[in-house]
Amino acid sequence: MQIKEHASLKAFHTFGIEQTCSYLAIVDSIDDVISLYQNPAFQSLPKLFLGKGSNVLFTEHFDGLVIVNRLLGKSVSETHEDYLLHVQGGEDWPSLVAWCVAQGMGGIENLALIPGCAGSAPIQNIGAYGVELKDLCSYVDVLDLTTLKTRRMSAEDCEFGYRDSVFKHDLYEKCFVTAIGLKLPKRWTPKNQYGPLQNIPENELSPNAIFERVCQVRMEKLPDPAKVGNAGSFFKNPVISQDHYDQLVRKHSDMVAYPANEGMKVAAGWLIDQCGLKGISVNGAQVNPLQALVLTNVDNCSADDVVALASLVKRAVWDKYQIELEHEVRFMNRQGETNLAKIEAAQ
């Protein structure tokens, strides 16, 4: 285990903004995590677990211990009907999806190129193109950070919702995801109802065809974090009431929306685009010109630049549509998690 003091976080989050933390530890075993929690030097400090740092913005120096998950390994067993995968939490998610497809295991291909680690996937209940992690997840293994004992949670225990789970609520900061279990059906059924996947000819449909198309679309629309700092989709797609949608669609007949939970889920990228915000910048932070849902670090921006840009976008969408955008990216201040509303209120 490596432990660094007053460490730079620039290489540990995909926004690539220069920021620091008091301590940074890179762990490759559960015992490493237990030893950190038992170390008197760290017990009173705020702690934050990171995978690839692909969904986080450090708004200032983090005055605590950042723990980077590098628990690696995966195994496959099978039943008559399913492939059963056990995946360590530090495994790279895009590499896992590509490996599954190459091995002939379908069902996961819609989730190609979502940045991050396997251990982060259930926290966010990652999803794309009509598939969410909850559709594939059979269990999540966690380390209880109070008892320092491991346990297995069923998918039902995880209380998955839209970009949501029990790990953001009742179990927030109370456990560390060590591994996940995935169940991929041997009898493959395509999920091709969304966007560009509908254009794949029926006789060409396969896990690999969907995987290739998803990768193609993502690479065309989404900037590579290795080249342009970003955290993927910055805002969640908001869910509004049917009445609100009916009022809006009378004025905006081309509004992009889908039925969801007795309401309508509106495409946040469409809302931002319709406000004329593609390409707009605040210093070195920019709304991506190709995909308005992504905020990028195009010129050594500061966290303050990203916060100001996010605030501008949120306000513009509210003024035009009376829809409140909620950021999907986690904001971290000196002591732990915060949000845009709290930052705005303090200014």
Swiss-Prot record:
List of catalytic residues: 163, 233 (proton donor), 328
Pathway terms, separated by semicolons: Cell wall biogenesis; peptidoglycan biosynthesis
A single GO cellular-component term on record: cytosol
Cofactor requirement: FAD
Annotated EC: 1.3.1.98
Catalytic activity: UDP-N-acetyl-alpha-D-muramate + NADP(+) = UDP-N-acetyl-3-O-(1-carboxyvinyl)-alpha-D-glucosamine + NADPH + H(+)
GO biological process, one term: regulation of cell shape
Highest taxon above the source species: Bacteria
Keywords assigned by UniProt, alphabetized: Cell cycle, Cell division, Cell shape, Cell wall biogenesis/degradation, Cytoplasm, FAD, Flavoprotein, NADP, Oxidoreductase, Peptidoglycan synthesis
Compartment(s) of residence: Cytoplasm
Coiled coil feature spans: none
PROSITE patterns assigned: FAD_PCMH (PS51387)
Family of this protein: Belongs to the MurB family.
Record HAMAP family: MurB (MF_00037)
Entry function: Cell wall formation.
PANTHER family linked to this entry: UDP-N-ACETYLENOLPYRUVOYLGLUCOSAMINE REDUCTASE
Protein name: UDP-N-acetylenolpyruvoylglucosamine reductase
Organism: Vibrio parahaemolyticus serotype O3:K6 (strain RIMD 2210633)
